[in-house]
């Protein structure tokens, strides 16, 4: 219980410190995800594992990202992808440079239930177009809009999924213009 309270406090501190801020270090956002995962592991036990992979040429202290961007995606992976799995669930967070460019791609993937083609197509539409009747996809829509507003229209979110194999949500952002000065 004491550890859970400590982790919840750490998570709340991050949320409050970043309320109203434009950018935070990628390292801070990844630390927040690690805290969130530890809290969820208390809830789910050994039903899932987590792996973080960051390319060596990405300086997570210098690279800046919109705060609170990744947690809703990790939460979706747990709730929609892995919650029904009894064991062997896996969430992977991969941070990589896109080719030789100054862009980075952050991919959050799970080995959960995945989606059929029709569900995936609808989710992709919901991410791009606001649908007031669909409350479920509003978080992903908002994340995609935040990315486009802050980084430009060429950036954003992409979703891949295969039924019974899992889902991957990728965010592409610019690393070049978001360096600490």
State where each predicted segment sits.
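Two-component histidine phosphotransfer core
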Residues: 1-160, 168, 172
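Two-component histidine kinase transmitter core
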Residues: 174-178
